[in-house]
Amino acid sequence: MNLKNKKILITGATGGIGNSLVKKFSDLGAKIIASGTNEQKLENIKKIYQNVQIEKFKLEEHQNIEKFIEKVFNDLGGLDILINNAGITLDNISIRLTEENWKKVLDINLTSSFLMCKFAIKKMLKQKFV
């Protein structure tokens, strides 16, 4: 698979899977924006990978997702691939999970992914990449 110079946004880039995705796509020559909420881990990514830009972004801020996608699109000069890798768990045992925490998990893990796709696809369609 040739991903050289493909423009990729990876959310949840500071976690284990996200970091592995950044490494793999970086090794394949992609242009990447790595997104997460942990500034120190984002800075570490920036130090390790020369072709990776970093952006701190909180996915629960739904009102800012469209602007975030616009910024990513402008910074990369387009967007070819969106990887919705970010997610949270608050308690692995459902009988202890409060309804409030359940809603927070759904909000970040599902609603944010939906909105990221919605706004990214709009940009991609204009590029004719979808």
Predicted regions and their residues:
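Active-site loop of short-chain dehydrogenase/reductase
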Residues: 6, 78-79, 124-130
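Conserved glycine-rich cofactor-binding loop
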Residues: 14-15
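Conserved glycine-rich Rossmann-like NAD(P)H-binding loop of the short-chain dehydrogenase/reductase
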Residues: 28-43
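The beta1-alpha1 cofactor-binding region of Rossmann-like NAD(H)/NADP(H)-dependent oxidoreductases
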Residues: 56-67, 99
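Conserved NAD(P)H cofactor-binding loop of Rossmann-fold oxidoreductase domains
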Residues: 86-90
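Substrate-binding pocket helix/loop in short-chain dehydrogenase/reductase
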Residues: 93-94, 98-106
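A short, exposed helix-loop element centered on a Lys and neighboring polar residues
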Residues: 117-118
